[in-house]
Amino acid sequence: MPSLPTPEKKGKLSRLRIFCRYRLQFQAISSASAFFLAGGLKLGWSVLERPTVNSQKLIATHLLTIAWFVGVAAGSVLASAFVQRVSKNLAHYLSGVFLVLGGILFICAPTTFASLLCSCLLEGCAYGINQIQGIVTAGEVAHKHIRGLLVSSERIFLWLGICLQLLCTRLWFSMEPDNGYALHVNQLHGFVVILIALAALVLNITYHFESPLLLQMQQRDLAATYVMKCLQGAPYPCLEIVQKREECKQLVEYDAGQTVWMVMRKSNALPLLKLLLLRCYGTISLSLPVNRTFITASVTGLKCTINCVYLLAICGVFGSILGALCVDKYGRRNIAVISLLFSGTCAFLMGGILHYIYEQISTILLTHLTFELVVYLMFCYQIFVCAGVSMASSVYMSEAFTVAMKAKCLAAVVVCEQALQITLALILFYVDFNEPLFFFFIGVVGMVMGILALFFLPETMCMSLYESLVKFNKVPS
C-alpha cells in the first residue's frame, strides 16, 4: 500500500515552539522516563559501583552484579506478552509495584544478600517491562519530526540515573561524619527508588494518553481521533489528523492475516539482525569490563582516591543529550556511521596503549600520563557511543518492526543485550581477562560496523512510522 503524501509546513518551527506544540507527547512518556531514571540508579549501584553486602563470599557480589540484567531480560519477555494488546497502564503499574517492593527490601534489609538479590531482580524486571512499553509508546505517539528526541528519553534518563547514583554515593562517603550515619547507604538508595516509583505512578495518572495505534487496533475510532487531536496540538480536524489516522490503518493492515513465521521472515528478520548488532555494540559501553578498565586507569591517571566512574557517567549524559538534539536534524544513519567509526577508533587506540603499558610497564617513566591518555580516550569513546550508536539504535527500535511483532522483536533485542552483559561480567570474574585484546576487538568491530551501516542502515529521519517500516525492508538509497 503506498504511503500518503506528507502535508508540508508553511514555516519551520523553532525548537521551543515544537516543545510547546507537542508538549502532550512529552508528557505521555514522562512516567516511562521516571522508570528509566530508577533503572539507571540500580544499574549504577550494581555494576558501576561495588554492591555493598554483608556476605564475605565473592559469589554474592558476582550474583548481585548480574541480577539486574537477569531481571531486565525476564521483564522484557513478560512485557512481550501484553504490550500493544492492553493499556500501557498495566506495564506502568506493574513496574511501579516492582520498584516499590525493591525499594522496601533495600530499606528493611540493606546488607542482607537475599534481600538485595530479590530487589535487583524486581527492579530489573520493572525496567524490562517499562523499556518495551516505553519505546513502543514513544514511537507511536511522537510526531515524525521529534520521534528521535522523544525515544531518546530512554538513554538520557538511564544515564541520568547512573550519574545520580554515583554522585550521591561519592557525596555520601566524602561527607561522612566521624561517628557515621544513622542510615545505611543502601537504605538511602531504597528511599530514592520508592520516591521515583511513586512519582512515576502519579505522572501516569496525571498524563494518561493511550497510543492512537492501540486504540485503532481495538476499533475505538472516536477515542483514537480524540487522542490524535490532543497529541498533535490540533484544536480541530485537519489534514494532519487525517493522515495520522490513515497511517495507523496502514500499520495495522501491513501484516494482517499473515502467520507469525511469515511476518517474521518477510518483514522483521533482517531489521532484527541489524538492530541486534547495533544495540549490542552500544551496550558494551555500560559493561563491567569497560567500567573496571576505567577505574584502573583513573586511579593512576587521575589520582582518584574514590571511585571516579561518575566522570564516565557525565560523559554518557552529555553524549545522550547531544545525540537526542542531533538525531532528528542530521539523521539516524549519519550519526550512527560517524559514531561507530570514531568510537571504534578510540577503542582500538585504547587497546594499543594498554598493550604498550602492560608489555613495557617496567620501562615506562611516566605511567600516570599514559593511563591519563587512556582515560581521555575512554571519555571520547563513551560520548561517541552514547551520542550515536545507542541513540540511533533506540530510535530504530521504535521504527523497524511491524505492529504484530514489535514487542516480541524488542524483547529479543533486550534479552540479547542482557545476555551479552552477563557473559562479559562472567568472563571478567572467572577468566584471565585480556583488556588490550578486548578493546582491539571492539575497535575493529566498531569500524567495520560503521562501514556496513553506511550501506545497510536506512535513513528514516522525518518519516512516518509506516514509511520507516517500508524503508527498513528495502535496501537504502
Where are these regions (language model features)?
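Cytosolic juxtamembrane N-terminal segment immediately preceding the first transmembrane helix
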Residues: 1-55
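Flexible cytoplasmic loops linking transmembrane helices in multi-pass membrane transporters
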Residues: 2-25, 186, 233-298, 477
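Loop-to-transmembrane helix entry/capping segments in MFS-fold secondary transporters
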Residues: 58, 144-153, 302-303, 403-412
